């Protein structure tokens, strides 16, 4: 899949260039971290051993944001967690750094709410959607404009992420220029003579999620009427095929009926891919599907010295210099799609993509004309292919593209932001659980509620009894912090006073842990606890909302302290004092 290839290429190129002191990866769970750690060990073992990577889960982001001074956060897709990360950054981070994400497929109906999430007061001037093509820039701009109009005043005045265009790149080292002997061998295997022309279409073989190749077969049929017989042509269709997909069968039957020599090569390896590029004469890609946004295979073909005949569609038009590195074929799209729009959230995206693709016309006569001009003129093919190789290798290698990212992040960090406004912003789509579900329990915790340790709590404090702490709450229920809280409540104390004391202690622990930070994993347990053996609480402090002196982000720390207090009440380590 193009998305996976692009994301891996981005990370690999960034780490090879190595412009930063450390690289942090935060994934959803420890299983994903284990897989990533294995991959890093294979390709970047030295950096891993030197502590250049910090690996953590999403749940550890608040701790990491307080602990490290980040240059930027970059997501592999602009529709993953941009707004959620901006919320966490605004609340926890030492500074307002850029949050960026790259476009890939933009056509799924479920994406509209994800764009809406990014329209809020907490979006900073340093937050950017990185669109890979002019078409993607236009689409994302249209989405934000439409949402602003449809939601009216609720969105007016909300900040929007900026949109910058940076293309995807390719790993040029994986695309060596063709070898003459290998070219001859592959062509012989296909039954292609020296004077035959091989047309290569390399993409996911799917009429509903990539491109409909039947119009290409019709264009080849037209070539016969233009003096180029099918006996001199070979159409090679290569790429991933979904199990059970009937597309290859349909293509094969239609090609046979038209007398076209079709070779279908499913899921070729990288080596086989390069051999096919080297054996071909023209790369053809009449894409018609809005699932496509960029077009990595056009760059690969160009880097291998092939002229490209492609539809003038989406990101393709950015990659082909028409008349110099290849030829663009005009396309025609629908003026209205109300019937599709109304069903798009109720049917599979593949059905929507297919319907839209079948209303997107790649001009068959123009496609035939473009192919004819290159088939009939081998010198033009060689000239365009050589220019394509120069153009792609000068502009689209990952090492070049990564430089554009680094320049963007530096520029974004220099932009002014209203830090106080950002830190106070509340996302309108945030699920405020205490407010929304406050009617579920009999009552809520109050500041004047009097509590003390129970017999079980005293036993835990003295080490006689060990609490059972579920893995999912281990970040809140720290054993040493629990002992501190129990000791502080031994004589009786208000919930408000205990909350502030525990929050203040959390701040001290975090400062101690920050001073002991290293290039280890988040939560590795290397930093020692800074809790004292005993601490006399100040009973005069009783307001849950009162900030403890010097506490960074007191409301958040007090929220976590309340969580520990409630957990201790739940498990009978604290008890309420009857009034």
Model-derived features: positions:
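Short hydrophobic beta-strand element within catalytic cores of glycosyltransferases
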Residues: 307-310, 320, 327-328
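Donor nucleotide-sugar binding/catalytic pocket of nucleotide-sugar-dependent glycosyltransferases
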Residues: 124-181
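C-terminal amphipathic helix plus adjacent low-complexity
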Residues: 347-488, 494-500, 578
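Conserved catalytic-core segment of nucleotide-activated headgroup transferases in glycan assembly
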Residues: 171-267, 450
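Extended catalytic core of nucleotide-activated donor transferases of GT-like folds
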Residues: 7, 33-122, 503, 575
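Short alpha-helical donor nucleotide-sugar binding micro-motif in glycosyltransferases
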Residues: 267-270, 276-280
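Acidic donor-binding loop of glycosyltransferase active sites
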Residues: 278-292, 306
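Nucleotide-sugar-dependent
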Residues: 286-296, 317-318, 335, 339
